[in-house]
Amino acid sequence: MSIEELARDNVRRLTPYQSARRLGGNGDVWLNANEFPTAVTFDLSQQTLNRYPECQPKAVIENYAQYAGVKPEQVLVSRGADEGIELLIRAFCEPGKDAVLYCQPTYGMYSVSAETFGVECRNVLSLDDWQLDLPAIADNLDGVKVVFVCSPNNPTGQIINPQDVRTLLEMTRGKALVVADEAYIEFCPQATLTGWLEEYPHLVVLRTLSKAFALAGLRCGFTLANKDVIDLLMKVIAPYPLSTPVADIAAQALAPQGINAMRERVAQILVERQYLVNALKDIACVEQVFDSETNYILARFTASSAVFKSLWDQGIILRDQNKQPSLSGCLRITVGTREESQRVIDALKAEQV
């Protein structure tokens, strides 16, 4: 028996998530992973690397709870929000029996995580405006334990209608969790659903330090939920999910000075986003620029594959969305520095279409 044959059937069939780094490239303008364009620095204050870290570092939990407006017992910290996705599926879904549901086009890790654990995936396509198709969701809820809703949605950039999410929460009460992925909520904080946690005990909110906090390399995310949900997740999380340096930096990033710095970064990105949107609308190969509430822009291009390859060859790395349902011809562009935006604009203007 070969090593391949020893592996689980579903793992042999699995197509891994194609992260920005996995796709590679030799660029000097990286606009494919929705990272903050410049680095932030911190001084490490904890020098106890000979000891194992806390499972849930107190300073990180308390600082995030204060920032998010929830109780500390409603917060779980993990290795990025991606680990939160995995924990929810592991804790609530029986392999071979239960299902998760999501609405494409959306973030790809919901399906990859479910498939890894042998849990059925149900994809209910979004409406033409990328909002929830509530009747279709209702028709597909049997056996579903977790519904993932990305808002603002990656890669389309729009907020999911809050009233539709409320309808979904009523529809799933006593049947399934509704997980609102708010990875990009710092760019539109008025749209957060954290204020609904008391009203809906089956609501879960995912957050991250990877985007507006400019700490994608830290791998630190949060799950906000009813205490009963957090207690169950604590049963399946690894004993030491955060290293001591990660917890040290996260606590600093979530202190008042760190929060203020994050909000200044958001204001900077919003200015740069508008600059890039205005320029894209006047470029010949750009057919449509979609509204965005995030730090990235989705646009539809004439000959998008050729445009993508041309910019790639010039060291400008964007994210190709052609394989996502309803996103034919679309590329996603992270909002970077003014210099990076200008590189994109100049390269696109030079395209012959």
Swiss-Prot record:
Signal peptide stretch: none
**InterPro entries from the UniProt entry:** Aminotrans_II_pyridoxalP_BS (IPR001917), Aminotransferase_I/II_large (IPR004839), HisP_aminotrans (IPR005861), PyrdxlP-dep_Trfase (IPR015424), PyrdxlP-dep_Trfase_major (IPR015421), PyrdxlP-dep_Trfase_small (IPR015422)
Alphabetical UniProt keywords: Amino-acid biosynthesis, Aminotransferase, Histidine biosynthesis, Pyridoxal phosphate, Transferase
**GO MF:** histidinol-phosphate transaminase activity; pyridoxal phosphate binding
Q: What is its EC number?
A: 2.6.1.9
Q: Which residues carry this modification: N6-(pyridoxal phosphate)lysine?
A: K211
- One of the protein's GO biological processes: L-histidine biosynthetic process
The enzyme class is: transferase
Gene3D superfamilies the record matches: Aspartate Aminotransferase, domain 1, Type I PLP-dependent aspartate aminotransferase-like (Major domain)
Q: Which CDD domains does this one have? A: AAT_like (cd00609)
Q: In which pathway does it act?
A: Amino-acid biosynthesis; L-histidine biosynthesis; L-histidine from 5-phospho-alpha-D-ribose 1-diphosphate: step 7/9
Q: Which reaction does it catalyse?
A: L-histidinol phosphate + 2-oxoglutarate = 3-(imidazol-4-yl)-2-oxopropyl phosphate + L-glutamate
Ribosomal protein found in the keyword field: no
- Please name one Pfam family that this protein belongs to: Aminotran_1_2
Q: Which cofactor does it need?
A: pyridoxal 5'-phosphate
Q: Which family does it belong to?
A: Belongs to the class-II pyridoxal-phosphate-dependent aminotransferase family. Histidinol-phosphate aminotransferase subfamily.
Q: How does it assemble?
A: Homodimer.
Protein name per the record: Histidinol-phosphate aminotransferase
Give the species this sequence originates from: Enterobacter sp. (strain 638)
Q: Which gene encodes it?
A: hisC
